[in-house]
Regions:
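Exported/periplasmic ABC-transporter solute-binding proteins
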Residues: 28-29, 34, 38, 42-76, ...
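N-terminal secretory signal peptides and thylakoid transit peptides that target proteins
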Residues: 2-18
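A short alpha-helix-loop-beta-strand transition element characteristic
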Residues: 127, 132-141, 200-203
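C-terminal motif of bacterial Sec signal peptides marking the signal peptidase cleavage site
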Residues: 23-25
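Alpha-helix termination/capping residues and helix-transition junctions
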Residues: 20, 99-100, 223, 268
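Pocket-flanking alpha-helical
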Residues: 90-131, 237-240
Length: 295
């Protein structure tokens, strides 16, 4: 059965189609906006002694491709500045920071994990009283989209969230979602609730399998180990998958990526400067090429 892209998924699919060219061009471009030039000049200040400086960035797995591309350009513009990236689920990264891992900049795929580390967040959000976030540096950096993907050549007839819900109710497919501590899993839980589906019952019936981060969910769909999975638009791009539907705000809310420098950052000023660079038009072009919306 030929899979059609729903109207909700059209913009994401269109962005995926043009993403490769933008990511390829990013590293070799010599053009620069005024804001990115200013940020680059500022970044050079901390590495002015000629010694190399390594920024440690903890970021949601869905940022792997874009941050690597942007960092390549940034390092070329700022000799001596290098990056050590830790890409994983936001829940895992939050735990590592809490346990004392060195981290200059944290970019989460959800507000929940950032709030848990931010003492200025509400008591409902900062349930453990943790104080790792430099609150003045915190910004909402990006918005992503939650999409439904199926393996290439699938004949299950899953072409929308509506049809997914019907198959889940019939218990005749295997569906993959993120764990409950992973933002994409939390968004998926909201989608299931939207359709009055009970995750625990579906899992007990053997209808659901899990991934520890969004990349694992994407891999299971790509390898046709499952009949469908919920991932981000950006991860659909990186895996070469075409989304068949896009979740609405009513289904799971907005997918906002907050970013903040950590209070115990080894290179706090340089981290702030790189975060400022991530908010330039130049960086936005890379983010938006794979389906993100720069905020």
């Amino acid at each position: 059965m030929k899979t059609m892209i729903s109207r909700r998924g059209f913009l994401c699919a269109a962005g995926i189609a043009s993403a490769s060219a933008v990511l390829t061009a990013c590293g070799g471009s010599s053009s620069s906006t005024a804001s990115s030039t200013a940020s680059s000049a500022a970044a050079s200040s901390e590495a002015a002694s000629g010694e190399s400086m390594e920024l440690i960035v903890f970021a949601a797995a869905s940022l792997t491709e874009t941050l690597n591309a942007i960092a390549g350009t940034y390092s070329a513009e700022n000799p001596g500045v290098t990056f050590s990236f830790n890409f994983d689920s936001s829940g895992t990264l939050k735990t590592q920071i809490q346990e004392g891992a060195d981290c200059d900049l944290f970019i989460s795929a959800g507000q929940k994990q950032m709030n848990q580390l931010d003492s200025t967040a509400s008591a409902e959000g900062n349930t453990e009283g943790l104080d790792f976030v430099d609150a003045e540096s915190r910004v909402d950096l990006l918005e992503n989209k939650v999409v439904l993907c199926v393996p290439e050549g699938s004949n299950k007839g899953i072409d929308s969230f509506d049809s997914l819900a019907e198959h889940l109710k019939a218990e005749d497919i295997l569906f993959c979602m993120g764990n409950s501590d992973v933002p994409v899993g939390q968004y998926t839980q909201k989608i299931l609730a939207y359709y009055d589906l009970y995750e625990a019952a579906l899992a007990a019936a053997g209808v659901i399998t899990y991934g520890s981060n969004v990349k694992e969910v994407t891999t299971q769909v790509s390898e046709a180990s499952v009949d469908a999975g919920v991932v981000y638009c950006t991860d659909a791009y990186s895996a070469g998958l075409t989304p068949v539907d896009e979740a609405t705000k009513e289904m799971c809310g907005q997918v906002i990526y907050p970013a903040a420098v950590m209070k115990n950052a080894l290179h706090a000023e340089a981290a702030k400067e790189f975060l400022a660079y991530l908010r330039t038009d130049k960086a936005a072009t890379v983010f938006e090429s794979v389906g993100f919306t720069a905020l």
